[in-house]
Swiss-Prot record:
GO terms for molecular function: RNA binding; tRNA (cytidine(32)/uridine(32)-2'-O)-methyltransferase activity. The keyword Metal-binding does not apply. It comes from Sodalis glossinidius (strain morsitans). Catalyzes the formation of 2'O-methylated cytidine (Cm32) or 2'O-methylated uridine (Um32) at position 32 in tRNA. This is tRNA (cytidine/uridine-2'-O-)-methyltransferase TrmJ. Its EC number is 2.1.1.200. InterPro entries: Alpha/beta_knot_MTases, RNA_MeTrfase_TrmJ/LasT, SpoU_MeTrfase, tRNA_m1G_MTases_N. Homodimer. Its main location: cytoplasm.
Length: 255
């Protein structure tokens, strides 16, 4: 399960934070590190601060954009240090650990951490099923990147250890769509709603954001998402004007 947990750092500016993150991961048994467009590639400082976890850095996946880091993931959780304009389904760190381990039994899970100064953008957070907020001291809530990773990595490990102690029960596991399938669904949904005039194609605005929040909260399974895609396709077909049958001349009265 733990190998299916991805720690995703977005546009990290200090290489030392990459090293400290690798150390935090390895102490909790995590090994899958993704670096999204880091401002600087891992260097000697990163290796030094990894304190023996240089293998995590050496095996890290360096990608150009967030979609590449989320490819194949059925659950995406983004860290957020502040309240946003559009509320999103929230998890406590402990809930995040439990849900991550439950999902990681079937498919990769991504835990997203943003830039040191400004965190994740709204667009990046909208790609998440849930947000997680660490309940730090309101008077001094300054956690550095590696500290935040350490806290969530610890909760993941606690949940994993609990799962090992529980009696194994055979249950039919739910299969959830991966991130890119959800993105294709949202694109299809926006296209159909624009075609019906429900939203303006040039300015989808908050409507699509709210629909993303709705479906992320509902967590449709893969089969359910296929049904929704089928419904959208059916709507598209009803919008297309029927092509009149070609006139073959049959049935005309003879002169």
């Amino acid at each position: 399960m733990l190998h299916n947990i991805r720690i995703v750092l977005v546009e990290t500016s200090h290489t030392g934070n990459i090293g400290s993150t690798a150390r935090a991961m390895k102490t909790m048994g995590l090994s899958n590190l993704y670096l999204v467009n880091p401002l600087h590639k891992p260097d000697a400082q990163a290796i030094a601060l990894s304190a023996g976890a240089s293998d995590i850095i050496g095996n890290a996946s360096v990608v150009d954009n967030l979609d590449q880091a989320l490819a194949g993931c059925s659950l995406v959780v983004g860290t957020s240090a502040r309240s946003r304009t559009l509320p999103w389904p929230m998890l406590e760190p402990r809930e995040c650990g439990v849900k991550s381990i439950q999902e990681a039994a079937q498919a990769p899970v991504a835990l997203l951490f943003g830039r040191e100064r400004v965190g994740l953008t709204n667009d990046e957070l909208q790609k998440c099923h849930f947000h997680v907020q660490i309940p730090a001291n309101h008077e001094y809530s300054s956690l550095n990147l590696a500290m935040a990773v350490q806290i969530l990595a610890y909760e993941v490990r606690v949940a994993w250890l609990d799962s090992q102690r529980q009696d194994a029960t055979v249950q039919e596991a739910s299969v959830y769509p991966v991130a890119e399938d959800l993105e294709r669904f949202y694109q299809h949904l926006e296209q159909v709603l624009s075609g019906t005039g429900f939203i303006r194609r040039a300015h989808p605005g908050l409507v699509m954001n709210k629909l993303r929040r709705l479906f992320n909260r509902a967590r449709p399974e893969s089969q359910e998402l296929n049904i929704l895609r089928g419904m959208l396709t059916s709507i598209e077909h009803t919008q297309k004007p029927e092509t009149p049958a070609p006139d073959t001349g049959h049935g005309r009265p003879q002169a």
